[in-house]
Swiss-Prot record:
This is Phosphonates import ATP-binding protein PhnC. Part of the ABC transporter complex PhnCDE involved in phosphonates import. Responsible for energy coupling to the transport system. Its main location: membrane. Residues 2-246 form the ABC transporter domain. The complex is composed of two ATP-binding proteins (PhnC), two transmembrane proteins (PhnE) and a solute-binding protein (PhnD). InterPro entries: AAA+_ATPase, ABC_transporter-like_ATP-bd, ABC_transporter-like_CS, ABC_transpr_PhnC, MetN_ABC_transporter-like, P-loop_NTPase.
Amino acid sequence: MIEFKKVEKVWPNGKHVLKDINLKINAGEFVAVIGLSGAGKTTLLKTINKINNISSGEIFIDINENEKYEINKTKGKSLRNLRKHIGLMSQEYNNIEKQTVLKNVLNSRVAQMNFFRAMAGFFTKEEKQNALAALEKLNLLEFSYIRADNLSGGQQQRVALARTINQNPKIIIADEPVSALDPILANRVMEDFKKINSELNITVIINIHHVDLALKYCDRIIGLKDGEIVFDGDPKKLNESKLEEIYGK
């Protein structure tokens, strides 16, 4: 569960990018955040793992009964532990192109390895099996030993998703992951998100400009306008009037 209480974010130049954000996202939800560029979507997502600090308010994250975090008070080792549970994706694939697909997926475990094993690039049999399972989950197993730079953009983004789920996260935050893809590939990637959300019960929060994809795949849509939530609910209730409120000038 992720809960925002009266969250505000003001940049040093005085720009108010998040205004009185109050919302609760339950475990296992697939949530789309929509709105114009500059509405505060990316800033909102980046407060969840404290890439962006908030100016006021509170954010609470419950990973399980034994791991509960108040973001304002989370730092050091506690923050590192929280971030292990949060997978990050963006429109950039962030693959190492000269490495194989399997090695790219294995790289998600490096942060949890000791220094010498990480430097040597040594992965255990279990780690390799888990990485292959992540690729199989997304029907990418046949590409395991192919260099990443031989794949299409859509395939590379799906490898990035496999790498993210190999991290074994409870939450995935995706910032415009399909913006650089054509409609067919964008749908394929969204299908993958939906699959891992439903089959692995991973909470997925996605910042997306494609409203049609949000309506098609997501359980809930949050609409931001000038840093404020102006819509939060079932995609079926997102009518023309609400879209005009979110995107109108």
